[in-house]
């Protein structure tokens, strides 16, 4: 997989916009690529420590730290209010999780019914990015073991949350739902970037998913920010690898 911080859109030449040179993807291709993806992503922190990609890494780390500091001040409001009950019902963790998992499947089936290999490949890439993002998120959660806001009483201490969660019950940092949502949004935005409405809708829905994780008290704002950035970078990197294909 390409560098996780190579965020510049890949330009398409006139030949690339009309000729597809890459064979269509399948589930076997995605599974084979996952190992390479994960090796590349888990090697990134070591490169960052050595000073590589500082322009992308430093702002991300600094913003995450700032949000972590603010978590103990902003999270109690969401822990104590019931103003978001309707929104929380519409964007429950179960609903958003199912939607993320079923979206690539639906696009694959639609692409096959319409004999649209570009749509089918887009769906496989979306599934690849989703799996990559979820693996990163879940492993990170088991390393940081951060309590969820819902694990803390409304009048409790929201400042002492790290390395206190039960290893088997689930932890908070980063948000897996948000990482998955932004990974999907980034893939489809890259693949269908000629349709100006796609990025607006894709990233708009992903943002709503991220906000719901805060109002549901499943995550702190810093968890959501970190998950969104990680998912977005992963999705963009995966989604721009095959832009030489013929697309809409």
What are the functions of these language-model segments?
Residues 57-65, 101-105, 126, 130, ...:
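Alpha-helical transmembrane spans of integral membrane proteins, capturing the lipid-embedded, hydrophobic core
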Residues 82-89, 121-124, 226:
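Non-cytosolic membrane-interface motifs at loop->transmembrane helix junctions
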Residues 51, 56-57, 113-136, 199:
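Interfacial segments of alpha-helical transmembrane regions
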Residues 83-84, 118-119, 194-198:
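Membrane-helix interface segments
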Residues 1-96, 100-114, 142-143, 150-171, ...:
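N-terminal targeting leaders of membrane proteins
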Residues 153-248:
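Membrane-embedded catalytic cores of phosphoryl/pyrophosphoryl-handling enzymes
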């Amino acid at each position: 997989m390409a560098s996780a911080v190579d965020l510049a859109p890949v330009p398409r030449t006139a030949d690339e916009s009309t000729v597809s040179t890459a064979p269509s993807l399948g589930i076997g291709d995605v599974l084979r690529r996952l190992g390479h993806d994960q090796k590349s992503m888990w090697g990134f922190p070591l490169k960052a420590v050595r000073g590589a990609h500082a322009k992308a890494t430093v702002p991300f780390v600094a913003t995450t730290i700032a949000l972590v500091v603010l978590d103990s001040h902003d999270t109690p409001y969401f822990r104590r209010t019931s103003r978001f009950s309707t929104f929380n019902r519409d964007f429950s963790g179960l609903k958003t999780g199912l939607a993320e998992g079923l979206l690539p499947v639906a696009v694959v089936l639609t692409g096959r019914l319409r004999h649209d290999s570009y749509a089918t490949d887009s769906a496989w890439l979306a599934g690849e990015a989703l799996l990559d993002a979820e693996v990163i998120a879940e492993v990170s959660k088991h390393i940081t073991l951060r309590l969820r806001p819902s694990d803390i009483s409304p009048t409790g201490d929201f400042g002492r949350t790290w390395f206190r969660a039960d290893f088997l019950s689930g932890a908070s940092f980063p948000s897996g739902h948000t990482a998955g949502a932004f990974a999907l949004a980034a893939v489809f935005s890259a693949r269908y970037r000629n349709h100006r409405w796609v990025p607006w809708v894709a990233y708009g829905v992903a943002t709503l998913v991220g906000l719901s994780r805060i109002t549901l008290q499943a995550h702190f704002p810093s968890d959501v920010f970190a998950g969104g950035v990680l998912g977005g970078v992963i999705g963009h990197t995966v989604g721009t690898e095959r832009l030489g294909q013929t697309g809409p």
